[in-house]
Regions:
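N-terminal pre-catalytic segment of deacetylase/amide-hydrolase enzymes
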Residues: 1-26, 31-47, 61-64, 186-206
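A short, conserved beta-to-alpha structural element at the edge of catalytic cores
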Residues: 45-72
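Charged helix-capping and loop-helix junction motifs
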Residues: 67, 91-98, 150-157, 182-186
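Acidic-and-aromatic substrate-binding clefts and catalytic sites of carbohydrate-active enzymes
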Residues: 30-34, 53-62, 84-92, 115-122, ...
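CE4/NodB-like, metal-dependent polysaccharide N-deacetylase domain
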Residues: 40-49, 75, 84, 91-123, ...
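Catalytic grooves of carbohydrate-active enzymes
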Residues: 163-176, 180-203
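His/Asp/Glu-enriched short active-site or ligand-binding loop at hydrolase and phosphoryl-transfer sites
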Residues: 120, 126-161, 196-206
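Hydrophobic faces of well-ordered beta-strands that scaffold small-molecule active sites
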Residues: 23-27, 50-52, 76-79, 112-114, ...
Length: 206
């Protein structure tokens, strides 16, 4: 992430302000049975907590998984109902879709955290969602696990090297990311654990 980006877009949370050795793992696009259960099992090994930015339609398909996420002490958060691209969606449709996902989430546990799919959201959409009480969460590190052409070892090396206290890291618990995720996540968590880091869910101000 370019260092100037958070300064330009101050309405978003890019990392958590802390000097403690804590990493904030986030998982986008689930729940999806195989990758999500793998993630939950891996988190359990490290007594780690995480934040799951879920697509509402996937929650409705896999309600038992959404409940498992909550039962294991993690956070369910909003990633729109249908994984919309903010730049290509009308203002009203985007806000309605986000609110529809929120209604689904509130059947389990209310969180004010929201991440726009692809990180794409307009100023007007941002203004409306923040006025409605959403906290817009971006990231300072991304795994690129969704890209099946990446050099996994090189991507891991960069991810580990650039991790800092308070980093918000993006993985994906999706079928598309599965081949890369199942290799990268355990190795990343082991490396950071060896450096003395713990893993927590993103705190909400609500």
């Amino acid at each position: 992430m370019p260092s100037w980006l958070p300064k330009l877009f101050k309405n978003y949370t890019w990392k958590i302000n802390t000097t403690e050795p804590i990493i904030y793992l986030t998982f986008d696009d689930g729940p999806d049975p195989k990758p999500t259960r793998f993630v939950l099992d891996t988190l359990e090994q490290y007594k780690a907590k995480a934040t799951f930015f879920c697509v509402g339609e996937n929650i409705r398909k896999h309600r038992e998984l959404a409940q498992e996420i909550i039962d294991q002490g993690h956070i369910l958060a909003n990633h729109t109902m249908n994984h919309l691209k903010g730049w290509q969606t009308s203002h009203n449709d985007y806000v309605k879709n986000t609110n529809k996902c929120q209604e689904t989430l509130e059947e389990y546990s209310a969180s004010s955290l929201f991440r726009p799919p692809y990180g794409r959201i307009t100023k007007r959409q941002t203004k409306s969602l923040k006025e409605a009480g959403y906290e817009i969460i971006m990231w300072d590190l991304i795994s690129y696990d969704y890209d099946d052409k990446i050099d996994i070892n090189q991507a891991l090396k960069q991810l580990i090297r650039n991790s800092k206290p308070g980093s918000i890291v993006v993985f994906h618990d999706s079928t598309k990311a599965w081949k890369q995720l199942k290799i990268m996540l355990p190795k990343y968590m082991q490396a950071l654990n060896n450096q003395g880091y713990s893993f927590e869910s993103i705190p909400s101000r609500r």
